[in-house]
A protein has these predicted regions:
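Phosphate- and other anionic-substrate recognition elements at nucleic-acid/protein interfaces
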Residues: 2-11, 18-154
Length: 154
């Protein structure tokens, strides 16, 4: 198999008001696997959230992070997107790794569809949605990286 792809791991995050869904790529940067949901009691209580992300980044030897960017449907930047930008800046400062923003519109809808197909009761969707959304966001990013690399190598 030709081509030399660097071994790297990327963390995918779905940042919400009280949770952060977490996914991680395999070492080849080809597939995303969901990891966990980091929960916090209040929106601005982020100390434990950052500490846990730092632990995961160290454990998985993360080289970059992909973070959801919740633009409005008309492409405008709303309150959630502003909070995500502040979260991004703090991540970059604390972890010293690049953080890439990915348009995450409709990932929750896609996550709901996946859970329904898996037979998860709708009443339990809240237990998994952020983690699955993080996996979708990261997988979309990885797919785009692979497609770009394929086009360049042709």
């Amino acid at each position: 198999m030709g081509g030399s792809r660097e071994l790297m791991r990327i963390l995918g995050l779905d940042y919400g008001s009280k949770t952060v869904g977490v996914a991680v790529s395999d070492m080849l940067g080809m597939t995303a696997q969901r990891l966990e949901i980091i929960r916090r009691p209040k929106e601005n209580h982020l100390r434990r959230t950052f500490r846990r992300i730092e632990e995961l980044a160290k454990e998985y030897e993360i080289e970059s992070i992909v973070l959801d960017y919740p633009l409005n449907m008309d492409d405008s930047v709303g309150d959630r997107a502003e909070k995500t930008l502040a979260f991004k800046r703090e991540l970059e400062e604390r972890l010293n790794v690049p953080v890439f923003l990915v348009d995450e519109r409709l990932t929750t809808v896609e996550a709901d569809e996946i859970m329904a197909e898996c037979g998860i009761p709708r009443s339990d969707f809240g237990l998994y949605v952020d983690m699955i959304a993080a996996e979708i966001i990261l997988q979309d990013y990885l797919n785009n990286m692979t497609n770009t690399a394929s086009k360049v190598s042709l």
